[in-house]
């Protein structure tokens, strides 16, 4: 039996609320509701949001399309955090609007690194000629 203090990953409720918050943030960003020159110049993707166990903190992982100007975009989102929080509160029915944090999404970089690794000569040599031909 698992002890209550052990971390087993996010609960179903955390995942459901995280997805609602993700949709709300993405909608605000896509509609251009924020009056910020940095944000208006970029299309920003929000691939993931993670909620704290008490649902009072949401960490949004964001990436500008094309991967350019990541740091200025994150800084602009942090500057507009209060407005975004109000918009999330309007769109998501929760007792408390979660505080928002923004982080750079590194999953694209990690996937590219793994892809480069799998395509490297050393790995291809280890896989042998049968793997390359799909046999």
Curated annotation (Swiss-Prot):
Monomer. Binds 30S ribosomal subunits, but not 50S ribosomal subunits or 70S ribosomes. It holds the Pfam family RBFA. The lineage of its organism: Bacteria, Pseudomonadati, Pseudomonadota, Alphaproteobacteria, Hyphomicrobiales. GO terms for molecular function: ribosomal small subunit binding. It comes from Methylobacterium nodulans (strain LMG 21967 / CNCM I-2342 / ORS 2060). PANTHER family: RIBOSOME-BINDING FACTOR A, CHLOROPLASTIC-RELATED. Keywords: Cytoplasm, Ribosome biogenesis. One of several proteins that assist in the late maturation steps of the functional core of the 30S ribosomal subunit. Associates with free 30S ribosomal subunits (but not with 30S subunits that are part of 70S ribosomes or polysomes). Required for efficient processing of 16S rRNA. May interact with the 5'-terminal helix region of 16S rRNA. Its main location: cytoplasm. This is Ribosome-binding factor A. The keyword DNA repair does not apply. Gene3D superfamilies: 3.30.300.20. NCBIfam families: PRK00521.2-5, rbfA. Belongs to the RbfA family. The gene is rbfA. It is found in: Cytoplasm. InterPro entries: KH_dom-like_a/b, RbfA, RbfA_dom_sf, Ribosome-bd_factorA_CS. GO terms for biological process: maturation of SSU-rRNA. GO terms for cellular component: cytosol. It comes from the Bacteria.
């Amino acid at each position: 039996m698992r002890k209550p203090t052990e971390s087993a990953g996010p609960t179903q409720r955390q995942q459901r609320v995280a997805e609602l918050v993700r949709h709300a943030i993405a909608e605000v960003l896509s509609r251009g509701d924020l009056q910020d020159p940095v944000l208006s110049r970029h299309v920003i993707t929000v691939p993931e949001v993670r909620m704290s166990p008490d649902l009072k903190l949401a960490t949004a992982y964001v990436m500008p399309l094309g991967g350019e100007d990541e740091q200025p975009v994150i800084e602009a989102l942090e500057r507009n955090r209060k407005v975004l929080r109000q918009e999330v509160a309007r769109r998501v029915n929760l007792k408390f609007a979660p505080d928002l944090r923004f982080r750079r999404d590194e999953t694209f970089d990690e996937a590219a690194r793994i892809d480069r690794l799998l395509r490297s000569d050393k790995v291809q040599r280890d896989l042998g000629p049968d793997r390359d031909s799909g046999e």
